[in-house]
């Protein structure tokens, strides 16, 4: 990103796109590609995102689906078209991309060659919400608009739905992102490090044999609470040689108790994630035009009952957990909507509420969690 910012200021890039600055955004990848080897550019007819490339292979038709394009940091979120000034820096023009279509658009039928290979005929291919979080958020079993969502997996993505982009000095300072929603809405959200921390620790613990997530949670439950905290989003946790050592080093450098056992380390991670969610939810509430009364946790991480409970306690609001396979469910029901079987987003969410059994977790010991929040904030700021 820094090389790109030499050509256009970081603030200007954010103002034009509303997308969180991250080094893997398509804008920066294409910039680096051109600088390091531009031989492919003259040979390129169209640039397709991966979901659109798959659709092309199935149908022979090229499109650019809105939700995946919105994450590229090349799209104007107000006009929903590629920003020419950003493309020009990368020696590109809008005609290098296929036409932008909304989620739920019928791209076409399976091509003849695919039909021959598969034995399937007259099958429509739908442009689903190509960004997995957009599909997952569609599957949030919300009853009204006064909620935030947390798509919980290796990454935790916490946000709200907005009818319009929210791009201002606050969102820039907090590095919030404005990604496209499946219904053309905006998903104002923050990327947070999620289960990555526990996944990497689990690899270390399994050197001596298999360790289950249930065993990790049980060990954490048996450990003393609120002994040490980390900032889950600290760069030192991005790709350390040993996640356990990185967590211990963080605690050592901030003058805290140094966790040693599996339970102590896991508890440190879960409590710190819950407090990080509290932090981000507070920022979201300051940006939202409505009261956030509930947090919906969806995705694989929603199966972690301990973290769900910790999160409810930390935020002081009810948490509704599930469904765990939100991305797949949202994808399927969006196709049902395209086929005319389902009317709209509200009906999709009603179907999900009736088809699955989301678990509601009420907050407990809120004052105790509030007391220890300041200790988390001290070490969060310190590194």
Give the residues covered by each predicted segment.
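Active-site core segments that coordinate phosphate-bearing ligands/cofactors
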Residues: 5-18, 22-23, 28-61, 74-76, ...
């Amino acid at each position: 990103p820094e090389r790109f910012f030499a050509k256009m200021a970081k603030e200007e890039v954010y103002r034009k796109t509303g997308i969180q600055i991250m080094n893997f955004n398509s804008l920066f990848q294409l910039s680096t590609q051109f600088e390091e080897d531009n031989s492919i550019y003259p040979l390129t007819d169209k640039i397709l995102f991966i979901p659109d490339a798959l659709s092309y292979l199935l149908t022979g038709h090229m499109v650019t689906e809105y939700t995946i394009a919105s994450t590229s940091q090349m799209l104007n979120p107000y006009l929903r078209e590629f920003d020419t000034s950003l493309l020009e820096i990368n020696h590109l023009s809008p005609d290098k991309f296929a036409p932008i279509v909304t989620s739920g658009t019928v791209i076409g039928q399976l091509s003849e060659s695919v039909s021959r290979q598969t034995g399937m005929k007259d099958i429509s291919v739908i442009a689903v919400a190509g960004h997995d979080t957009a599909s997952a958020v569609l599957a949030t079993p919300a009853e009204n608009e006064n909620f935030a969502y947390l798509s919980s997996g290796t990454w935790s993505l916490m946000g709200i739905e907005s009818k319009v982009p929210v791009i201002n000095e606050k969102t820039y300072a907090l590095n919030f992102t404005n990604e496209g929603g499946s219904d053309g809405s905006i998903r104002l959200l923050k990327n947070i490090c999620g289960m990555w921390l526990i996944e990497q620790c689990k690899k270390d613990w399994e050197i001596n044999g298999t360790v289950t997530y249930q065993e990790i949670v049980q060990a954490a439950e048996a450990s003393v609470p609120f002994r040490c905290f980390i900032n889950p989003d600290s760069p030192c946790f991005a790709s350390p040689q040993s996640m356990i050592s990185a967590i211990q080093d963080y605690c050592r450098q901030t003058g805290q108790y140094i966790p040693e056992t599996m339970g102590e380390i896991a508890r440190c991670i879960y409590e710190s994630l819950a407090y990080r969610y509290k932090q981000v939810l507070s920022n979201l509430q300051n940006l939202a035009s409505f009261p956030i009364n509930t947090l919906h946790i969806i995705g694989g991480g929603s199966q972690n009952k301990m973290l769900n409970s910790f999160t409810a306690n930390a935020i002081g609001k009810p948490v509704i957990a599930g469904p765990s396979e939100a991305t797949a469910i949202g994808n399927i029901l969006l196709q049902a909507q395209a086929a005319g079987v389902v009317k709209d987003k509200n009906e999709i969410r009603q179907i999900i509420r009736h088809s699955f059994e989301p678990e509601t977790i009420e907050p407990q010991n809120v004052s105790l969690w509030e007391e220890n929040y300041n200790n988390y904030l001290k070490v969060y700021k310190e590194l």
